């Protein structure tokens, strides 16, 4: 049952990160693509914006995919946690803790869950379990 719980966590978080990466990279799911995301990154001081958007989008898309299928799970968790750490520092941190105030509550939750999965392991239903 634990492995099923870990699978559900990995799937929900991994697929969500993949979708956010696709928003940044391709403009899918209501996103703004590299140009729009890059412009916003520039506006918050993350320069060069297009390069930062590419790095963030790839981290979310690739990290999310790896996390969902449980392949190279510690690396995937690091990609997710790193993205959330930067989001906390650059965007949400100054707004305080609560998500209702655009704070870092949700980002911290995702960061801790990703790191926790890296520590616990991805479970039986993961590519890592087949290989390692």
Give the residues covered by each predicted segment.
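Extended, low-polarity transmembrane helix blocks
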Residues: 1-36, 42-43, 47-58, 62, ...
């Amino acid at each position: 049952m634990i492995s099923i719980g870990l699978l559900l966590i990995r799937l929900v978080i991994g697929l969500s990160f993949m979708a956010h990466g696709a928003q940044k990279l391709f403009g899918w799911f209501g996103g703004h693509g590299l140009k729009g995301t890059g412009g916003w990154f520039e506006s918050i001081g993350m320069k060069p914006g297009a390069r930062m958007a590419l790095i963030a989008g790839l981290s979310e898309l690739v990290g999310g995919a790896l996390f969902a299928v449980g392949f190279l799970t510690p690396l995937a968790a690091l990609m997710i946690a790193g993205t959330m750490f930067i989001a906390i520092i650059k965007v949400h941190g100054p707004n305080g803790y609560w998500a209702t105030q655009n704070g870092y509550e949700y980002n911290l939750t995702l960061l801790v869950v990703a790191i926790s999965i890296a520590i616990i392991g991805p479970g039986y239903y993961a590519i890592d379990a087949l290989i390692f």
